[in-house]
């Protein structure tokens, strides 16, 4: 064999590999790439299987041996509830709302505006991610409550101060619920509206429209202020849940008319029911924000507001003013239609609403009232209890001879047209200027009033100190004091109620607050008719009585004039409040000449303890000597009158017309049997046989006269002095 041939045969494969080396390299590269891809796929699948097998809460990232938790977006960090309260209602609502917010696992803080400094802390809410809720009440004359006074003052000044600007609170989120009474129509929920407006002017974002609670059960959208708040609270919690999830949508561009647009028509079910249609207007904001419902203010509105903020040509001013007037007319028409509908005062079943709400029933029951039907009540006077024990009667016993243990204190109307600062009923009674509630029949009211009164008397059976004969007498009602609470003359069937009293041989003592002159003129004869004369000037009357009527002074004077034509016994009741109405002697004298009452009761105000609804303190209570001095000075100005009686225990004196002083003796007491005979003759003659106060007067005993050693205390009874004096909780 040829050696050269063998060499070629051995080198041929190597030469072939060399020649095809490119393809070999390519094959190796492809193989390695495939291997790498397979490894990546295997590892990825294994990781996915591992993640599925581990709970989601434990899927943390490991970095250099440390656990790094995934951060979650927080859209709402908490809720701050600010309240401004006078009687405690707003504070109670704040507590209820806080409980609802807590159920969402959100931190919540309740803050009294009296203890909050907006100058230092309000700006913090811009970046805090909190939702701020303001529960604010409207108090006298549309002003804020004492606790919210400084906050509102600061907020108003900041809203109009150019140094703060329109973006000062940009980023702050808020909601407002106002508490008010639509009976005060001119400033209903004014504070809530203002707080809402001022926050918006400073750039804060409203998360939902303003809620409005109404104490007037007739006009309240849901039947009571508590129900109004519950409805608003439900919507707020729903809105808060949406904010927690970070749900967002484009806000309205602000060009919609009357606050209506397609986006909000779809969500109309969520629109706040507590605000009026004329208060629904969307403010321009081009940013992407949380879902919200907006309400408008009368001062700002849509395109008009935008155009007024920019430069306006003089010739365009006329068009703008015409447009503003047109909007105002449309608003008034909507308010009128809304008012006509709301004045019907019907509940969901179409029935006329009752005056007594569940919350009012609870409050009055705690105060010892026995409620009757839907608008009446009866309560046992402390003087009734006193006379059952033989410890003396009230000043009516001293002045007019009533038997205090046989006197039933009641009212057919818990509602009143005033909010007197010295009212000892704790300002829980409803207010109104006319009857708009469901009405009970007088027969039922009288029947249940007597039954409830007798049941309260029965509780004293066997009580130590109670005299058996007086207990038996007390079971038969002989007198009715229509002075418990409210304005009894508002009750549409008051005349029928009085006739029923007289048919039962029960004398009638009716007290009115001098705001219903027509009703006084149309009133049937009563045993004794009182008019409360709490002040002698327009300003002081407004300050003390806080009346609902705008023309309260004219009504007051007309009521006194109506009293002058009454033939039966009439009385002015003056309540002296030191530093408020004790320096108006000449004005009081003029009022006396206007009504020519038979008697004038002058009584020092009774301090009934601290009340958030009144600024009255012990410093306003005059000493008995001061009351005596006032009466002496007043008598000097009214020559036809003299001081007749005194009841030192009640801090009260009686001024009587001289016609009741016969033969040097006073005849201020009442012959009750004679009155019943006269009223029966009056009824039998259909009112033609009239009678006067002198026809049923009786001689006043010596111990009741002014200057007597007894100082008005009946010597038949035993004077009792408590070891620990406590505040009076009720009285005539």
From Swiss-Prot:
[4Fe-4S] cluster binds at residues 416, 420, 423. It catalyses: N(1)-methylguanosine(37) in tRNA(Phe) + pyruvate + S-adenosyl-L-methionine = 4-demethylwyosine(37) in tRNA(Phe) + 5'-deoxyadenosine + L-methionine + CO2 + H2O. PROSITE patterns: FLAVODOXIN_LIKE, RADICAL_SAM. The keyword DNA-binding does not apply. FMN binds at residues 85-89, 176-208. Residues 287-299 have a biased composition (Acidic residues). Its cofactor is [4Fe-4S] cluster. Its EC number is 4.1.3.44. The keyword S-adenosyl-L-methionine applies. InterPro entries: Aldolase_TIM, Flavdoxin-like, Flavodoxin/NO_synth, Flavoprotein-like_sf, rSAM, tRNA_wybutosine-synth, tRNA_wybutosine-synthase. Residues 400-644 form the Radical SAM core domain. Pathway: tRNA modification; wybutosine-tRNA(Phe) biosynthesis. Binds 1 [4Fe-4S] cluster. The cluster is coordinated with 3 cysteines and an exchangeable S-adenosyl-L-methionine. Residues 79-237 form the Flavodoxin-like domain. This is S-adenosyl-L-methionine-dependent tRNA 4-demethylwyosine synthase TYW1. Residues 248-312 are annotated as: Disordered. Belongs to the TYW1 family. It is an enzyme of class 4 (lyase). CDD domains: Radical_SAM. Keywords: 4Fe-4S, Iron, Iron-sulfur, Lyase, Metal-binding, Nucleotide-binding, S-adenosyl-L-methionine, tRNA processing. One of its GO terms (biological process) is wybutosine biosynthetic process. Pfam families: Flavodoxin_1, Radical_SAM, Wyosine_form. Residues 259-286 have a biased composition (Basic and acidic residues).
